[in-house]
Amino acid sequence: MIAGISGRVLKKSGNVLLVETKSGVVFEIVCDVQTSEEVEEGGECFLHTFLSVSQDGITLYGFSNERKKELFLSLTKVSRLGPKTALKIISNEDAETLVTMIASQDVEGLSKLPGISKKTAERIVMELKDEFESAGIKDMRIYHESLEALISLGYPEKQAREAVKHVYREGMKTSELIKEALKFLSQR
C-alpha cells in the first residue's frame, strides 16, 4: 500500500499529476479537482494516496488531506459506487459539506451533484449515514430554507452551502441562520 507521496510536480494535466519523488521515481496520480488546483507545476507537494487495483488496471488516487482520503474510502465502500464516481463526488463538493449531507440524509442535495441519481444518493445515505451520524445538521428544514433564501439573494449554491454549514449551531431559527450566513458571506 502506498499511503502518501512527497515530491515535485513535473506535470499537471487536468486532475492527473506526475509527481517525481526524491529517489527519482515518477508516479501518475489522479486527484480531485481542488487538490489539482492547489498544487503547482514545478512545486513540491505531499499527497495522501490510495492505490486501487481493479480489472481496468492500477490507479493511484491522491488527496491534499487525510479527511478527503477517508471520505473517498468511505464512498468506495458503497455498493455499485467505484473510485471514479467517488472522486467525481469529492471533486464537486467539499468534504465537510458532503459529510453533513450524508449525516443529515440530504438525498436531494446529493442528487444535485453531477452524475449522482436519486437512487445513488439514497444508497449513499443508507449505507453511510451511521458512519457520519454525529456530524450533520439536525434540522434539514432550517438548512434548506436558509440555503434557498441565500440562493434567491443571488449567492452561488456552493457559497451558500458553505456559509450555512459554517455558521450553523443546533437550535438556531431559520432567520438567525440566514442572518449569520449573510454576515459570514459579507466578510469574504
From Swiss-Prot:
Has three domains with a flexible linker between the domains II and III and assumes an 'L' shape. Domain III is highly mobile and contacts RuvB. CDD domains: UBA_RuvA_C. Transmembrane segments: none annotated. It is found in: Cytoplasm. This is Holliday junction branch migration complex subunit RuvA. Keywords: Cytoplasm, DNA damage, DNA recombination, DNA repair, DNA-binding. Residues 1-64 are annotated as: Domain I. Belongs to the RuvA family. GO terms for cellular component: cytoplasm; Holliday junction helicase complex; Holliday junction resolvase complex. GO terms for molecular function: ATP binding; four-way junction DNA binding; four-way junction helicase activity. Coiled coil: none annotated. Its main location: cytoplasm. Homotetramer. Forms an RuvA(8)-RuvB(12)-Holliday junction (HJ) complex. HJ DNA is sandwiched between 2 RuvA tetramers; dsDNA enters through RuvA and exits via RuvB. An RuvB hexamer assembles on each DNA strand where it exits the tetramer. Each RuvB hexamer is contacted by two RuvA subunits (via domain III) on 2 adjacent RuvB subunits; this complex drives branch migration. In the full resolvosome a probable DNA-RuvA(4)-RuvB(12)-RuvC(2) complex forms which resolves the HJ. HAMAP family: DNA_HJ_migration_RuvA. Residues 143 are annotated as: Flexible linker. The RuvA-RuvB-RuvC complex processes Holliday junction (HJ) DNA during genetic recombination and DNA repair, while the RuvA-RuvB complex plays an important role in the rescue of blocked DNA replication forks via replication fork reversal (RFR). RuvA specifically binds to HJ cruciform DNA, conferring on it an open structure. The RuvB hexamer acts as an ATP-dependent pump, pulling dsDNA into and through the RuvAB complex. HJ branch migration allows RuvC to scan DNA until it finds its consensus sequence, where it cleaves and resolves the cruciform DNA. It comes from Thermotoga petrophila (strain ATCC BAA-488 / DSM 13995 / JCM 10881 / RKU-1). One of its GO terms (biological process) is DNA repair. Gene3D superfamilies: 5' to 3' exonuclease, C-terminal subdomain, DNA helicase RuvA subunit, C-terminal domain, Nucleic acid-binding proteins.
